[in-house]
Each structure stands twice: as structure tokens, then as C-alpha cells.
A protein has these predicted regions:
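Conserved AMP-binding A3 loop
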Residues: 34-38, 173-199
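Conserved ATP-binding/catalytic segment of the ANL
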Residues: 347, 354, 359-413, 418, ...
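Conserved AMP-binding/adenylate-forming core of the ANL superfamily
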Residues: 23-55, 59-68, 72-76, 93-98, ...
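Conserved pre-ATP/AMP-binding loop-to-beta segment of ANL
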Residues: 18-21, 134, 154-177, 184, ...
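Conserved AMP-binding/adenylation subdomain of ANL enzymes
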Residues: 196-211, 218-283
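Structural core segment of the AMP-binding/adenylate-forming
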Residues: 80-150, 444
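Conserved structural elements of the adenylate-forming
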Residues: 41-46, 169, 188-208, 215
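Gly/Ser/Thr-rich phosphate-binding loop
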Residues: 257-261, 269-339, 435
Length: 489
């Protein structure tokens, strides 16, 4: 099946799997609820109809929330109606989220009630914002609309215009923010073609009704493209993990066949396998993952090949990939029948690569349009259609990619998050007590080496080194309080 737009993916899936489960999620501790492909399509169409009443065509609409059925339905509702989705990290401080909302020219915000602080801050700090839709509210409260109530008031028929709205493959549909080496997040502009071809151009020979447990943050391109878009294109059952603290329990509850993970999670599960390694190999796999489990897809950061061999012993294949948000995001991946040691996989069919002065450049239909309202950064990243990845590496004659290092100054944590050292250094340097600061990664954690302004310290009555150290620790503690977990020092 050839898809031109994201709408085609859901439309075809609903035709093929209408009354079959599309999304499963927990209610209460151990009860599973489900929504079918028909329900998902109808709810997304209601959201499209609602957004059409509220905004202008091609409106920029932000999504802030953990993975949920309503988040997924909202995403399809936004892009299938010709609008632009702006998925944002639910864990960011309210001030930073408001800045991104404003920079992305967002006029409608769909938000989870767990971020009430963002709702209040956005009303004051985001002048372009016209409507706020709450995912949990059951009734409208002032200018905060209930998403559920408002969408259920919409009728779906031939006159709603949902299917009539013309969208083209090269139309902008999603802006995803990623950390940059300058310290300022960049809005990666992705089209329908970018995301659709990235998700569907490679036949990984996965069965149609795979059960996938979605554990990664949904605002990440990796989760959105591979869990959601690829999963739905294959008629998969997507099960929503409600907490990283409960992944092991949710594996037993949902009984998935496969999971997308980052290396940090794989390392955690490797320890669980080691804990029961004295049992027969088949029993080990069943104890940790269940007998039905067969595949882990790894991405976001480097994975030690030893883990691939360890999991293989217990009948679990790890398919390792390489990518970046600017490439929608997958550039290369291993597949069960085509693996080369020390490679991060073979280029996707829609992608080509070359090496320029040791740096890997890629080109293809998954490469972004550019960075939103950042022409200079776009010019630096894109050279005649080639994306400069910032990674050192090469491609062999069989199109396998090998990475040898990094060119750009960016920390990639084990959970796949990109952290700009300059961003953290700028925040700490705002204190008069800090003369110089160097942020770096060491043994999997972020650390800061701070040189105090001794003259200023003395003026503040901080005579002893220990007193200065205490004040600097207070500064770091204060920063950590407002920082998402992956940016903590």
C-alpha cells in the first residue's frame, strides 16, 4: 500500500481493521480499556471538525501531555484537517513551554490537566493563543474548553469537510522541537511525505496485528513515527504504558510482542535477565517478557553490542537504528535478516548518504524542510538538499552506516534525550557568583564544573571555600528543581 499523507494511513487501517482494537490503555490498576480503529478514525474526524470551527486553515496547534488515546486522536485530528501539530515535552518548565508555544505561532493548545500551571501561564504569556482545550475537563470553564465535550458535539457526515480538506504530501504537518548546539531549541519542520515515507518505506516483515507497548515519550519523533504511524499502518494494537516505573508490570498486563526502547531501558531489562539467568533460557524470557515477546527496537543513543548478544541468547532480537528528528527520524536500521557487526543498520530505501570531511551527510524524502523561522540555522544544516548530521561516520558499499564519533557539541543521554551544554551553561552563568562553567557528560550523568567569581564572593561575605561551595550547590539545586529529569545536573 502506498501512502501519500498521514490521513491515508488511518483511512486505510480503518478500512482493513475497523472493529479490531487499535489502542489499549489502563483504567484503574489492572483493567484494560480499548478503542477500535473505527472509533479512532471517528474521534479524530470529530476533532478535525472542531478545530475547523475554532481556527483558520493550517493553524498551528500544540499538544502537551503524556501518551494517551486522546493525544493520538488529537494528533490525527490536527494533521488530517490540514493543520500543523506541535508536540511539546510535557516535562518542560511552564516558562519554557510558553516560549515554544509563542515561537511556533500556536493559536490552539490541547493540554493534559497534569499541566494546569502551563494553562495558567499560557493565558498570560502567549498572546497568539486563542483557545485552550483540556483533555480531562468534562465541561467548559470560562475560556478553557473541554476537548471531550466539544468533540462529541461535532457530527460526522459528508458535509463536515474532513475528507474534503485538501492536503498534499509536501504540506507542513508537524513541528518538533529538538535541542541545538547554540542552546536554543529548534523547530524541525516535517511534512506528510517526510513522516509517512519514514514510517512505511521499509518492510520489516512484521506481522499485521503485532501488540506494541508504547513506552517512549510521544513528543519524540521516534515514538510518533515508529510506534504510532508505522504501528497503525500495520494494523497493530498499540498499548499505552502509563509510567516508566511500571513498564515491567505493564508487560505482564498487556503481553506485547515488541517494544521500542532507548539503551538505558535495555540496560535495565538486561539486569532483570541476569537476575534469573540460572533458570532455563525459555523460562528466563517468559519470566521477564512473556513467551509471546520477540523484538526490541533500539534507538536514540548508542547501544553496546553486548546487549544484542545477551538478549539473543533468550530468543529476543534487538533491531538497532540510527536517526535524528531532522530525518523524521530514522536514517538506518538493522532488520532480522540483514545485520552487520558494529553497524547501526542499513539506510532506509528512501535515503542516501555520503561522507564529507569525515561527517555523515544524508539526503532523501525524510529530510526536513528546515527549522521554523530560523533561516541561518537551516542554511547551516542543509546543503543542496543534504542534511549535515553532525555525526562522524561512513557508509559502506552495501549501504550500512558506521558511526565513529560526534562533530557537534551535544550530549546524548542514555535515554535518547539531546541536551545542549551551552543551554545549561547559560542558565548557570546568569548567577553573579559564577565566573565560568563547563557542562559535560560523565559516566552517563550530566555534571557541571564551576569556577566562582572570587571577588564577588568576598563582597557577599563568602570568605571560605566551603561557604562558596554551599552557595554553588544551592544554585544547582535551584536549577534542578525547574529542570526536566534528563537535564538535571
Amino acid at each position: 500500500m502506498e501512502y501519500r499523507t498521514i490521513r491515508d494511513i488511518l483511512t486505510n487501517a480503518e478500512k482493513c481493521f475497523g472493529n479490531e482494537d487499535a489502542i489499549r490503555y489502563k483504567i484503574g490498576k489492572n483493567e484494560i480499556a480499548a478503542k477500535t480503529y473505527t472509533q479512532l478514525k471517528e474521534d479524530s474526524e470529530r476533532i478535525t471538525a472542531l478545530l475547523k470551527k475554532l481556527g483558520e486553515p493550517k493553524s498551528h496547534i500544540a499538544l502537551i501531555g503524556a501518551t494517551s488515546y486522546l493525544w493520538i486522536a488529537s494528533y490525527f485530528g490536527i494533521v488530517d484537517g490540514g493543520n500543523v501539530a506541535v508536540p511539546l515535552d510535557v516535562s518542560l518548565p511552564a516558562e519554557e513551554l510558553c516560549e515554544l508555544i509563542d515561537r511556533a505561532d500556536v493559536t490552539i493548545l490541547i493540554v493534559d490537566e497534569i499541566r494546569k500551571d502551563v494553562i495558567e501561564a499560557a493565558k498570560e504569556k502567549c498572546p497568539k493563543l486563542k483557545y485552550i482545550l483540556s483533555m480531562q475537563k468534562e465541561a467548559n470553564e470560562g475560556n478553557i474548553l473541554s476537548l471531550t465535550k466539544s468533540m462529541m458535539e461535532q457530527t460526522i457526515d459528508e458535509d463536515t469537510g474532513v475528507e474534503k480538506t485538501e492536503i498534499t504530501p509536501d504540506q507542513l504537518c508537524t513541528i518538533m522541537f529538538t535541542s541545538g548546539t547554540t542552546g536554543k531549541s529548534k523547530g524541525v519542520m516535517l511534512t506528510h511525505r517526510n513522516l509517512v515515507e519514514n514510517a512505511t518505506c521499509l518492510d520489516m516483515k512484521l506481522p499485521e496485528r503485532n501488540v506494541i507497548l508504547s513506552v517512549l515519550p510521544i513528543h519524540h519523533a521516534y515514538c510518533l513515527s515508529m510506534d504510532i504511524l508505522k504501528g497503525i499502518s500495520l494494523g497493530a494494537i498499540i498499548c499505552i504504558n502509563d509510567s516508566l516505573m511500571r513498564v515491567a508490570k505493564n508487560i505482564k498486563l498487556f503481553k506485547p510482542n515488541m517494544i521500542l526502547m532507548v539503551p538505558l531501558m535495555i540496560e535495565t531489562f538486561a539486569k532483570k535477565l541476569e537476575d534469573v539467568k540460572d533458570l532455563p533460557e525459555k523460562v528466563v524470557k517468559e519470566a521477564v517478557f512473556g513467551s509471546q515477546f520477540h523484538t526490541i527496537c533500539s534507538g536514540g543513543a548508542y547501544l553496546n553490542p553486548e546487549y544484542i548478544e545477551l538478549f539473543e541468547r533468550f530468543g529476543i532480537q534487538i533491531l538497532q537504528g540510527y536517526g535524528m528528528t531532522e530525518c523524521s527520524p530514522v536514517i538506518s536500521t538493522t532488520v532480522a535478516w540483514n545485520v552487520k557487526k558494529n553497524s547501526v543498520g542499513q539506510l532506509l530505501p528512501n535515503c542516501e548518504a555520503k561522507t564529507v570531511d569525515g561527517e555523515l551527510w544524508v539526503r532523501g524524502s525524510s529530510v526536513m524542510q528546515g527549522y521554523y523561522k530560523m533561516p541561518e540555522e537551516t542554511k547551516t544544516a542543509l546543503k543542496d538538499g543534504w542534511l549535515c548530521t553532525g555525526d562522524l561516520g561512513y557508509v559502506d558499499e552495501e549501504r550500512f552506516i558506521y558511526l565513529t564519533g560526534r562533530k557537534k557539541n551535544l550530549i546524548i543521554t542514555k535515554n535518547g534525550e539531546n541536551v545542549s551544554p551551552e543551554e545549561l551553561e547559560n542558565k548557570l552563568s546568569s548567577s553573579r557568583l559564577v565566573q565560568e562553567v563547563l557542562v559535560r557528560e560523565a559516566k552517563g550523568v550530566i555534571e557541571a564544573e564551576i569556577y566562582p567569581d572570587e571577588e564577588y564572593a568576598k563582597k557577599q561575605g563568602l570568605e571560605r571555600e566551603e561557604e562558596v561551595r554551599v552557595e554553588l550547590q544551592k544554585l544547582i539545586d535551584e536549577y534542578n528543581q525547574g529542570a526536566p529529569a534528563y537535564k538535571k545536573i
